[in-house]
């Protein structure tokens, strides 16, 4: 069973991906997390990994062709928890002047990944969260103080808000038009009870809390 996480960005996909990888490995399953499929992979002894070397830079990230990515996916023998963020496809299409053909890529993903996790969030909250990020230049909060410091009124860019609403709608169509065996993972439900959500996703009777005694 391979898992593919689909995201527009800003819906907890990185947390879901890491939590799922930890959950599966704690359950005694050997899973790898190369993170994003579209911005740098490598295949070592038929093991698909994230591209990491001294030469890695942002100019490199989209240099791998879709055909090359498909080939690595088809050759990989390890169990995977991977991600596709729709914005990477948008950026790649811009970089390659809309010449890349993603039809085969989607076909390969649907064959290689048994279950596609479709990250969802209330569209208003999604657009508002991004509007606050746009206003404050703060992508995430990492402690209680940072959260308290953000408790104030602010004006947001209405046009930016509408743009994010439109992007979320496009993301929903993109997911449903190109992927099969979809499982929706709600942002709020996952944060409230991740163990329960991960059980529902995998079917395993396992809790991370029992492994780490927390």
For the regions a protein language model found, what residue spans apply to each?
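Alpha-helical hinge/cap motifs
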Residues: 12-13, 121, 210
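C-terminal accessory extensions appended to soluble enzyme cores
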Residues: 202-214
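PAPS-dependent sulfotransferase catalytic core
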Residues: 1-75
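PAPS-dependent sulfotransferase catalytic domain
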Residues: 84-181, 189-205
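A structural signal for short, well-ordered beta-strand segments and their strand-loop junctions
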Residues: 4-7, 28-34, 80-83, 115-120, ...
